[in-house]
Amino acid sequence: MTTPRLEAPGVVLRPLEAADAEALFAAHGDATTHTYWSSPAHTSVEQTRTYIAETIAIPGALAWAITESGGEALGRIALFVQREGVGEIGIIMRPEATGRGLASKALNAVVAHAFGPLDLHRIAADIDPDNTSSISLFLRAGFQREGTLRGNWKTHIGIRDSVMMARLRD
């Protein structure tokens, strides 16, 4: 599956590439930003570069750099299509890029692509229950909270539950 360039007012999503590692280390290397990920914050740009390469290589993965005009990556959003008609979205933003509506615009653009050209019927998200900003982001994008999976992840901050959220095609 080829990751296309997506554009919406105020945001350009371009295919994620290894060269984005330095810019995205600001997100993946930040302990606060990375709190609710399954792994601890990255300790080097090289670790972020490896993570990007591994993400891009996942079968069914579409991964984008979130930008304002196609330039430097301010965040990363990925859609993983691992079975027919169903995808899962993950997103991370650099700390200085939060609060500007970029994550919301990026999420809405990927949802439109998933339900349009990709013809998915369901998109899910797996979110730590303490990650209230991410839960709010997905609620604003029309996702519904479906339930909680108790003890779903063994992470660097302990065994964590997952809030399962999803949106169905209208």
Give the role of each language-model region:
Residues 1-31, 63-170:
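Acyl-donor (CoA/ACP) binding surface of acyl/acetyltransferases
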Residues 32-54:
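Conserved GNAT-fold acetyl-CoA-binding loop/helix
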